[in-house]
Design a protein with these regions (language model features):
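Intrinsically disordered, low-structural-confidence terminal and linker regions
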Residues: 1-18
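Intrinsic disorder/low-complexity signature
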Residues: 3-6, 28-30, 46
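Structured, mid-chain assembly/scaffold modules that mediate subunit interfaces
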Residues: 32-196
């Protein structure tokens, strides 16, 4: 049931992370899973339909080779693919899987940055930990950690009347229409005001 998950989400995440950091068996289970699932990571194998494009087989091979090279250039350099500039594409995949295994969720935002001479690619991926997806305080009476409160979007805001469960807004049919991502982590000591 929804209540079992939402009301205990924060505790489950804390325990999973504690086990990962303190119990070698749990650490090995997650790391082995990561290695077996991700392996060498996703790679691009371009294959264009040259007949639809009206190009010769040589032109198709040339385009495919160029596309694969561009992908490798983007994916291999952490400044190219990671919004925080910390991981290359393979490491982002590993991070996302580990976060999902420990937290039950992980979110990836696609961001655009201005191209630069040494960094011509504008697309960056930003991995968001599940903890940052939470119900805004003005929806839930001031409590957000774990975000388990079943809240309703207030009148005057887009989506008024929709329900919010643990930072996920759903319409009357149960379709996900929005995610509320906080700019800070729960219980983070900061002078920054928490916003969604």
């Amino acid at each position: 049931p929804n209540e079992d998950i939402n009301r205990n989400n924060a505790t489950l995440r804390q325990r999973a992370r504690m086990l990962y950091m303190a119990a070698p068996v749990a650490t090995a289970a997650i790391n082995t899973n990561r290695t077996k699932v991700i392996g060498t990571g996703l790679t691009l194998k371009a294959s264009v339909d040259r007949e639809v494009l009206g190009i010769s087989p040589e032109a198709a091979k040339k385009w495919q080779h160029a596309a694969e090279m561009e992908f490798r250039l983007w994916a291999g350099k952490k400044q190219n693919c990671d919004a925080l500039g910390l991981n290359n594409f393979m490491a982002l995949q590993q991070l996302a899987l580990k976060s999902w295994l420990m937290s039950g969720d992980v979110f990836v935002l696609v961001k655009r940055y201005p191209a630069a001479p040494l960094n011509p690619y504008s697309m960056r991926l930003h991995v968001i930990e599940a903890d940052r997806v939470s119900t805004p305080t003005n929806f839930s009476g001031g409590y957000t950690y774990g975000g388990f409160m079943d809240a309703v979007v207030p009148d005057g805001k887009p989506g008024a009347g929709h329900r919010v469960f643990d930072g996920v807004e759903v319409d009357k049919n149960g379709r996900v229409v929005a995610y509320y991502i906080s700019n800070t982590y729960p219980h983070q000591i900061t002078t920054e005001k928490q916003e969604w």
